[in-house]
Swiss-Prot record:
Belongs to the LuxS family. The gene is luxS. GO terms for molecular function: iron ion binding; S-ribosylhomocysteine lyase activity. This is S-ribosylhomocysteine lyase. It holds the Pfam family LuxS. It comes from Hydrogenovibrio crunogenus (strain DSM 25203 / XCL-2).
Amino acid sequence: MPLLDSFTVDHKIMNAPAVRVAKTMKTPGGDTITVFDLRFNKPNVDMMGEKGIHTLEHLFAGFIRAHLNADDVEIIDVSPMGCRTGFYMSLIGTPDEKRVADAWMKAMQDVLNVEKMEDIPELNEYQCGTYTMHSLEEAKSIAQNIIDHGIGVNKNENIALDKETLKALGNDV
């Protein structure tokens, strides 16, 4: 199995909350797609609760688009990580980490401004696969944690696993 980019960085030294350019690629049409690692929690230390991350998924995807989409950026997808320590965001364009962090922070403030469960988009059995698994209170707690701690930057070159370590962990490199 090929070694995926997300597993070539040392999760033990990764900071959170922090933004990281996980990958960039060119499409056949010449557009640049950038994938960001939006790390909410320190890996293997803390993770978001399932109800909170699910509610945040519904809110964050729209809110960050409102603050980041522009003539030079269009978000393709914002999805929670299986480990529940963050989200991956794929977009067309190349915004820098500060611009992404600023939009993320504004989106977290938007989450705090949501008043009731009925204000959560697509919260129904037709548009959500587990519509009863939500908590606005948990989502707000996650957002407040980001606001309280601020958002840093993880650079790949500072957290990359070296080839010897990857080999020792059983990876073909």
